[in-house]
């Protein structure tokens, strides 16, 4: 009955099909004007990684990616990202989108520098230039100053995606799983497999399915599949306030065991979470009681300047998740984060209440309604 079995395609045909799809993505994303990338053979990758040996394994950020170190004649240090997930036509599309966008942004300090890829292997890989060691982001281990720096780095990366190209790119899947830290503490955003571009002259695009962490989803994204730059701003606001400052893993961690009060569980959940944060601010509770307890324990004592920074940081995160018409752009968020770090120590009196330039024009209480 062997004749009934589906004949397996030769690897050369598979690589050619993937290459054709990648060319389509390069043309769609950047009119074919991306940074040059090298196509590695399967033998080159296997030799560089010692057949993906355990000794070359570096880290695993999330399913389905594994990262390996390697080297070859032209690159003494490279990082190889291997997708070990189940392969389908949809996954090939995502891989090609990841390669295309990575090739566009690889010159920026907050992205990995793409060298090339290998499409011949059963599980295709992407190859990055790496002169420094890179680590998985473990937020619980980071002190406050480094958390602020991580926030600014990722805000800068997202702002670049939104503004550096003729058509804005929306990242969509922000989470700590997609962030690497190099040995100097510079945060780098990875995995552009779900990036979507907004057509010229438009402010949003509609997608068939939402992807990412449910607790990071903006309202319009969940209800209507509408994606705009504000989709990333909302997710970043959650990442700032809930992960970097408060140390929450997910919304559900904070509300575990509670029953929803309405049929619209998502809407109820989001509004209740916003009210919780707002009441925390209005009650003027000490930051020692609000911020990530692990971080506070390591700090020992919070200075007045650090307390002001944390309050400004939290208020900015609330602005990011506030009413759609008043949500800042990622460029504004990145600038404000830089300001919080640099000028707060020089002008603590003007920011003693944690007020930021972005929230001075509006009562913070209006952020109860999350209408992104």
Curated annotation (Swiss-Prot):
Domain of life, per lineage: Eukaryota
Annotated binding of ATP, by residue: 1-4, 38
Pfam families documented for this protein: Pkinase (PF00069)
Domain Protein kinase positions: 1-314
Keywords: ATP-binding, Nucleotide-binding, Phosphoprotein
GO molecular function: ATP binding; protein kinase activity
GO terms classed as biological process: cell surface receptor signaling pathway
Signal peptide stretch: none
Region (Disordered), start-end ranges: 348-372
Residues with Phosphotyrosine modification: 128, 221
Skewed-composition ranges (Polar residues): 354-372
UniProt-listed PROSITE patterns: PROTEIN_KINASE_DOM
Family: Belongs to the protein kinase superfamily.
Domain notes: The protein kinase domain is predicted to be catalytically inactive.
Name assigned to this protein: Probable inactive receptor-like protein kinase At1g65250
Record organism: Arabidopsis thaliana (Mouse-ear cress)
């Amino acid at each position: 009955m062997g004749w009934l079995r589906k004949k397996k395609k030769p690897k050369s045909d598979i690589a050619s099909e993937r290459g054709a799809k990648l060319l389509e993505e390069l043309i769609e994303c950047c009119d074919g004007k991306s940074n040059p990338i090298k196509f590695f053979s399967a033998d080159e990758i296997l030799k560089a990684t010692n057949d993906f040996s355990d000794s070359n394994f570096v880290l695993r950020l999330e399913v389905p990616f594994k990262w390996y170190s390697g080297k070859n004649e032209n690159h003494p240090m490279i990082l190889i990202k291997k997708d070990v997930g189940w392969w389908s036509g949809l996954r090939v599309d995502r891989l090609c989108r990841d390669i295309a966008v990575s090739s566009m942004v690889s010159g920026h300090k907050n992205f990995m520098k793409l060298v090339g890829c290998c499409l011949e292997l059963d599980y295709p890989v992407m190859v990055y230039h790496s002169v420094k060691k890179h680590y998985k982001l473990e937020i619980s281990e980071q002190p406050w100053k480094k958390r602020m720096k991580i926030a600014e780095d990722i805000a800068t990366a997202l702002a670049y995606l939104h503004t550096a190209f003729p058509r804005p790119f929306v990242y969509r899947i922000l989470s700590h799983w997609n962030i690497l830290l190099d040995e100097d503490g510079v945060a780098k955003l990875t995995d552009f497999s779900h990036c979507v571009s907004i057509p010229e002259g438009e402010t949003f695009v509609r997608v068939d399915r939402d992807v990412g962490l449910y607790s990071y989803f903006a309202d319009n994204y969940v209800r209507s599949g509408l994606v705009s730059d504000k989709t990333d701003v909302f997710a970043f606001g959650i990442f700032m306030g809930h992960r970097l400052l408060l140390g929450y893993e997910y919304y559900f961690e904070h509300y575990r065991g509670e029953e929803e009060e309405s049929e619209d569980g998502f809407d109820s959940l989001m509004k209740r979470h916003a009210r919780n944060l707002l009441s925390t601010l209005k009650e003027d509770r000490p930051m020692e009681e609000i911020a990530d307890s692990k971080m506070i324990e390591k700090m020992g004592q919070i200075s007045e300047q650090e307390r002001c920074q944390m309050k400004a940081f939290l208020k900015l995160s609330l602005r990011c998740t506030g009413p759609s018409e008043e949500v800042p752009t990622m460029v504004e968020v990145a600038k404000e984060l830089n300001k919080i770090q640099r000028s707060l120590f020089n002008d603590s009196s003007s920011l003693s209440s944690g007020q930021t330039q972005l929230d001075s024009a509006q009562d913070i209480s209006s952020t109860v309604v999350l209408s992104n």
